[in-house]
Regions:
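Short pre-catalytic strand/loop immediately N-terminal to key active-site residues, enriched for Gly-Thr
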Residues: 74-88
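Short, small-residue alpha-helix embedded
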Residues: 21, 84-107
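Alpha-helical structural signal
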Residues: 2, 93-94, 118
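Charged C-terminal helix
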Residues: 108-145
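Glycine-rich beta-alpha junction loops
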Residues: 18, 56-60, 80-83, 115-119
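Phosphate-handling active-site elements
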Residues: 73-75, 100-114
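Conserved phosphate/ATP/ADP-binding segment of small-molecule kinases
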Residues: 1-74
């Protein structure tokens, strides 16, 4: 059903698993190259999406966010990987991207702001000792957005 909504989407924010599901492709044993990611994003653009960020690609203690906009060269937003995965991180990232974009911020800058915001919240959550399944503590930092 999600695939049917692609033509109506301006922004898509899939992680790798979701990207492969949207394209109905089997999940690979290796992380795709940037060229492969670009081809997959172009397929989503061909289906109607305008902007895509493939979030949270784990590469050597870094998290890569692959940013693709229709008609432009892809760009990368990279942040340090902090701890293990936390529930809700993708939701926070998607929310910040949407909010910043609606405030007429450039898409790439929106992704950059979202990645940095999530990193700050994850670090704070770890300092507080919050269990990963409880997500990230973002409320103290909302005013910074």
């Amino acid at each position: 059903k999600m695939r049917e909504l692609i033509p109506y989407a301006t922004i898509l924010t899939p992680n790798l698993t979701e990207l492969y599901a949207l394209l109905d492709i089997d999940y690979p044993s290796e992380i795709p190259s940037y060229d492969e990611l670009e081809k997959m994003c172009k397929c989503l653009v061909d289906k109607g999406a305008k902007m895509i960020v493939v979030t949270g690609i784990n590469v050597k203690n870094k998290l890569i966010n692959f940013v693709y906009e229709e008609g432009k060269k892809y760009r990368i937003v990279e942040v340090e990987k902090i701890g293990d995965e936390r529930s809700g991180t993708g939701d926070v990232i998607s929310g910040v991207i949407a909010g910043k974009y609606l405030l007429e911020q450039d898409f790439y800058k929106s992704v950059e702001a979202a990645a940095n915001f999530a990193s700050k919240c994850i670090k704070y959550s770890q300092e507080l000792g919050v269990d990963n399944h409880l997500g990230l503590c973002f409320e103290p930092f909302l005013k910074e957005l």
